[in-house]
């Protein structure tokens, strides 16, 4: 399966969290967004969809992740993998990501 991988960060305003998003585009048209906490990239979530625009996916995920990190369990999406550990090398790569576009800010 051929994929294209892009990366950018966004900030959850009033929360102080910086998220990194890797956007993976597959040849069959599926978008897979991999989200990581920038300052603690041992946690991540993955969201896959063929139907929503990038902006809508990111906004919805930002809202969901904000509630999750605040300790609320009122929002569950069946196609999102809950935060799970990732390997140390990937975590270091995320911390040192140099091709990052800054400035996507969402207010929750």
UniProtKB/Swiss-Prot annotation:
Keywords: Early protein. Belongs to the phi29likevirus gp16.9 family. This is Gene product 16.9. The gene is 16.9.
